[in-house]
C-alpha cells in the first residue's frame, strides 16, 4: 500500500493543531480529517476519531502497525512542510 496523494485542507496557526489533511492510498481509498498536531517532540498525526458516550475518543480508521503509521506520518508531514515553506 502506498500513499498516492496528500491534500492539506485547512491550516491554522493557533493552538497545537496545525492542519487537517486527507490522504489517498493506492489512488483508490481516502481517509479524511487526519490532524497534524504539534507535540513536545515535534509534529505528529492524529487519525480521525469520534467521542464515545463514556467520553473516550476512538479512532475511526487507523494503521494497525508501526511501519504503516510511520509511512503515513512521513508523507503527511513532508507535504505540510512543503506547503508551509512555499507560503513563506
Curated annotation (Swiss-Prot):
Keywords: Cell cycle, Cell division, Septation
GO terms under biological process: division septum assembly; sporulation resulting in formation of a cellular spore
Domain of life, source organism: Bacteria
Pfam name, any one: SpoVG
SUPFAM superfamilies: SpoVG-like
Signal peptide: none
InterPro entries linked: SpoVG, SpoVG_sf
HAMAP family for this protein: SpoVG
Function: Could be involved in septation.
UniProt family annotation: Belongs to the SpoVG family.
Protein name (database record): Putative septation protein SpoVG
Gene source species: Caldicellulosiruptor bescii (strain ATCC BAA-1888 / DSM 6725 / KCTC 15123 / Z-1320)
Amino acid at each position: 500500500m502506498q500513499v498516492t496523494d496528500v491534500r492539506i485542507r485547512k491550516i491554522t496557526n493557533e493552538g497545537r493543531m496545525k492542519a487537517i489533511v486527507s490522504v489517498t492510498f493506492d489512488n483508490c481509498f481516502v481517509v479524511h480529517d487526519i490532524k497534524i498536531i504539534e507535540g513536545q517532540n515535534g509534529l505528529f498525526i492524529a487519525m480521525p476519531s469520534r467521542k464515545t458516550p463514556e467520553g473516550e475518543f476512538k479512532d475511526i480508521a487507523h494503521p494497525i502497525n508501526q511501519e504503516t503509521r510511520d509511512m503515513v506520518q512521513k508523507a503527511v508531514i513532508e507535504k505540510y512542510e512543503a506547503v508551509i515553506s512555499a507560503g513563506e
